[in-house]
């Protein structure tokens, strides 16, 4: 986001939060294009056509059309009458929505930067790694007992998202443009498929709206958590303040003025940790089942009474962490009991002590991974490898490089797994899929092709994980072989991969 600095040198008092004119600037679409190249890279498939959609000529043509009068007038009777989006509707809408998402992120970025500077955090990018959540779980979750797995409800009406964003963006024209997109592509009377299609084509804008909504919900939750504990939550400092937030809290206290303090006394728990990922969140605690049920009650009432979201208690599951696995970011994580025996000796007497401690464990889930490979046409639903037909036009070296890249990325992302058997099976499927693809290209059988090629094809896949490991540890180090079998979390991963986004 530092690219904004050279374009935002104007005095803030002169801007008056008028973001709408930025939609006519070419550099906004250049920033959106650069962001798309970095984020929209797939671990399984390359987005080959993404670069062609954002040519300078198309951007200039789009801006010229927007300058013409009445092109952004929304027709409530027939959306086909809208001349602006009659041609290249999907392309133009995607370009405008991604550019609009870049613009709306500006007030968020400015307040976040000022918040980080006030706290003395200079290099905020060091905190961005997705894998940074797992060392936290290793340190904390083994000492906790219960966990709430929460499915965060979506807003029943997208106007709620607009109202939430209204307190961040003071420009009414920008909000009208946002409503234009929501009405045009998420017709309120159609099934959810339309909204799903909109969110997939305009991921950056959709995630911005959704995260701004979650920020409001988490603000009140962290307020309750801080009031109920003698130890203040360290994570609350990362949430940005809003002008109207204290008004909400004042209203909340006014509603529960009689029973507020009494109820909060029942929720005191200094050992409480909250983690959110995708549309789920985990609230882990060292408390009792009664305390967990009280928090479930508060979550349901908070969603229904203050955010107008219909939710049921069944969306919140209370689990004991030592015998339940958490499905988080492509891993099955658990805090299982690990028995150990210690021999002690006092004078002439020796004795054995049985001790069971909780140990954090992260396993690669095989079934969702096979489902993701089947969706990408590397195997069938049973896990039997098949050829990748769309890659048969590539050269042999390019095909091997494509499969090798996928294996290296999988080894990189799932390097923190304590049990690598599932990962080895996935790599075996990819290896045979590569062999079938090459055999199909040369119109031969897999056995004949492998016999003719030799072991050169297999070397790429067997050494993939070692190449990732030696990026950190020297190949000549004697300790590398021992570390190869241990769990290593790579803290440079800032994007979740396709296989962790299984549905």
From Swiss-Prot:
Keyword Methyltransferase: no
Any GO MF annotation of the entry: RNA binding
Record key words, sorted: Chloroplast, mRNA processing, Plastid, RNA-binding, tRNA processing
Record's signal peptide: none
Subcellular location per the Swiss-Prot or TrEMBL entry: Plastid, Chloroplast
Cellular component, GO annotation: chloroplast
Family note: Belongs to the intron maturase 2 family. MatK subfamily.
Function, as annotated: Usually encoded in the trnK tRNA gene intron. Probably assists in splicing its own and other chloroplast group II introns.
Name the UniProt record assigns to this protein: Maturase K
């Amino acid at each position: 986001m530092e690219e904004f600095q050279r374009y935002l040198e104007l005095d803030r008092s002169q801007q008056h939060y008028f973001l709408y004119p930025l939609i006519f600037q070419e550099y906004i679409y250049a920033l959106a294009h650069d962001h798309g190249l970095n984020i929209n890279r797939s671990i399984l498939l390359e987005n080959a056509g993404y670069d062609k959609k954002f040519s300078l000529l198309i951007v200039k043509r789009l801006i010229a059309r927007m300058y013409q009068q009445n092109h952004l007038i929304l027709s409530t009777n027939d959306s086909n009458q809208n001349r602006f989006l009659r041609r290249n509707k999907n392309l133009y809408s995607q370009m405008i929505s991604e550019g609009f998402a870049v613009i709306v992120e500006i007030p968020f970025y400015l307040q976040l930067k000022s918040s980080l500077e006030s706290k003395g955090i200079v290099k905020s990018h060091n905190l961005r790694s997705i894998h940074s959540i797992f060392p936290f779980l290793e340190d904390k979750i083994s000492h906790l007992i219960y966990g709430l797995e929460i499915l965060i409800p979506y807003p029943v009406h997208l106007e709620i998202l607009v109202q939430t964003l209204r307190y961040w963006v003071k420009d009414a024209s920008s909000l009208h443009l946002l409503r234009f997109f929501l009405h045009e592509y998420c017709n309120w009377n159609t099934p959810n498929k339309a909204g799903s299609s909109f969110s997939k084509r305009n991921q950056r804008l959709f995630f911005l709206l959704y995260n701004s909504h979650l920020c409001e919900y988490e603000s009140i939750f962290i307020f309750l958590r801080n009031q109920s504990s003698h130890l203040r939550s360290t994570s609350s400092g990362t949430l940005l303040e809003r002008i109207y937030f204290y008004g909400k809290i004042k209203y909340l206290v006014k509603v529960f003025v009689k029973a507020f303090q009494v109820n909060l006394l029942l929720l005191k728990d200094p050992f409480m940790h909250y983690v959110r990922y995708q549309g789920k969140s985990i609230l882990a605690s060292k408390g009792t089942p009664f305390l967990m049920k009280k928090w479930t009650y508060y979550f349901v009432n908070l969603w229904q009474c203050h955010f107008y979201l219909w939710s049921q208690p069944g969306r919140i599951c209370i689990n004991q962490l030592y015998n339940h696995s958490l499905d988080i970011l492509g891993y099955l994580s658990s805090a299982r009991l690990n028995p150990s025996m210690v021999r002690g000796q006092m004078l002439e007497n020796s004795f054995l002590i049985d001790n069971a401690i909780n140990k954090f464990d992260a396993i690669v889930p095989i079934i969702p991974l096979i489902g993701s490979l089947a969706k990408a046409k590397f195997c069938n639903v049973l896990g039997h490898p098949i050829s990748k037909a769309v890659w048969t036009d590539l050269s042999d070296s390019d095909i091997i490089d494509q499969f090798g890249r996928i294996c290296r990325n999988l080894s990189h992302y799932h390097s923190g797994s304590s049990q690598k058997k599932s990962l080895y099976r996935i790599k075996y499927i990819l290896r045979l899929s590569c062999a079938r693809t090459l055999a199909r290209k040369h119109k031969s059988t897999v056995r004949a092709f492998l016999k003719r090629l030799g072991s050169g094809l297999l070397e790429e896949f067997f050494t993939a994980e070692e190449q990732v490991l030696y990026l950190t540890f020297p190949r000549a180090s004697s300790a590398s072989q021992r570390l190869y079998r241990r769990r290593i979390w790579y803290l440079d991963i800032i994007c979740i991969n396709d296989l962790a986004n299984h549905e």
